[in-house]
């Protein structure tokens, strides 16, 4: 993959979840912004919540950007996460 997420932090307070992370471009080329989906998985690997996000700017080659998502979904029982790219920004 040409990008990865690091320094993932998930906090939940009063059914309000905040997700922050760095998005790292691991290539020698700029990559456009894109839509993505984060799924919270329980210990059995079942999806318990999901949220979609948008990285709305170009990430320069070998650099990173950050995301900050607030959602009214409860990720409190999250054991693992799954991230998938949905599509590039048109």
Predicted regions and their residues:
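Low-complexity, acidic Ser/Thr/Pro/Gly-rich terminal tails and inter-domain linkers that flank the onset
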Residues: 1-20
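Terminal connector regions
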Residues: 2-5, 50-52, 68-90
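Asparagine-centered strand-capping/turn motif at beta-strand->loop junctions
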Residues: 23-27
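Short acidic/proline- and small/hydrophobic-mixed sequence motifs that coincide with surface turns
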Residues: 30-33, 48, 78
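Hydrophobic beta-strand segments
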Residues: 35-38, 53
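Short aromatic-acidic-glycine turn motif
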Residues: 40-49
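Short proline/glycine- and polar residue-rich coil/turn motifs
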Residues: 56-64
